[in-house]
């Protein structure tokens, strides 16, 4: 499975940034943008752009910081706020989306093995965003006492709303804090400026509002990268961070490091 929407390649971060830049530039001063990572037809964002393995929590927070300090009206797709991942289905019968069955036949008729075809479906199928919400660690993730329309993702004993609510440093509580801060800083009406739009590893931008300037710095890779900031960081305070990397004009970001800095207007 090497082409089309089912192929999983190296993240084209430059293309992602250019898409955001295009819509913000087009609407600046005349309209209002919507910002969101995904919807019911796309893979779970922490599996698609992040890392749902060793860096699950860290990359989920990185994705939170990166998107939701941009101007516009923010939309969170259910499950994103607790770091829900793609499904872990092992059999074709576990899927429900009709597209899956057609594509499976296409894959295998072209020589793909069952496991290769299944991995492509686990990576990209629309059902990834349609599995039952994971409320707690009880049967069927607390979603229902009946049999759900499709299987619950197997990591629900670890990734669920109850566990997230009980942990003050969880992804869920970070979402709540960030959205309160969006309101306080007037993020929705800000002016967006990217640094190094062509860079394919880091995501750096400022958002200037009536309250001050927000600076977001994020590493989208599972390896360290070096960044040199074009904005003088000395007047900024660190407000959010998922890492221990000290802020500096030039710094090495560890995998999925992200930080949000703020300079208050006097």
Named regions from a protein language model:
Residues 1-266:
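Active-site and adjacent substrate-binding regions of carbohydrate-active enzymes
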């Amino acid at each position: 499975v090497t082409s089309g929407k089912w192929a999983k390649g190296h993240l084209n971060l430059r293309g992602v940034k250019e898409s955001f830049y295009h819509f913000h530039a087009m609407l600046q001063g005349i309209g209002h943008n919507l910002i969101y990572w995904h919807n019911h037809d796309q893979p779970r964002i922490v599996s698609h752009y992040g890392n749902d393995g060793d860096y699950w929590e860290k990359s989920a927070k990185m994705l939170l910081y990166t998107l939701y300090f941009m101007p516009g009206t923010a939309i969170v797709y259910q499950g994103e706020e607790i770091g829900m991942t793609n499904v872990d289905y092992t059999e074709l019968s576990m899927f429900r989306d009709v597209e899956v069955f057609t594509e499976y036949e296409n894959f295998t008729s072209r020589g793909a093995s069952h496991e290769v075809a299944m991995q492509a479906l686990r990576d990209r199928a629309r059902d990834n965003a349609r599995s039952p919400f994971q409320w707690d660690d009880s049967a069927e993730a607390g979603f229902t006492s009946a049999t759900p329309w499709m299987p619950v993702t197997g990591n629900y004993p670890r990734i669920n709303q109850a566990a997230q609510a009980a942990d003050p440093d969880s992804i869920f509580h970070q979402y709540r804090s960030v959205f309160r801060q969006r309101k306080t800083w007037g993020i929705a009406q800000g002016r967006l400026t990217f640094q190094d739009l062509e860079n394919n590893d880091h995501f750096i931008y400022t958002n200037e509002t009536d309250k001050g300037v927000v600076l977001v710095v994020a590493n989208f890779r599972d390896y360290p990268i070096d960044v040199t900031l074009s904005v003088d960081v000395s007047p900024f305070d660190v407000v959010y961070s998922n890492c221990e990397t000290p802020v500096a004009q030039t710094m090495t970001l560890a995998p999925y490091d992200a930080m949000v800095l703020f300079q208050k207007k006097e």
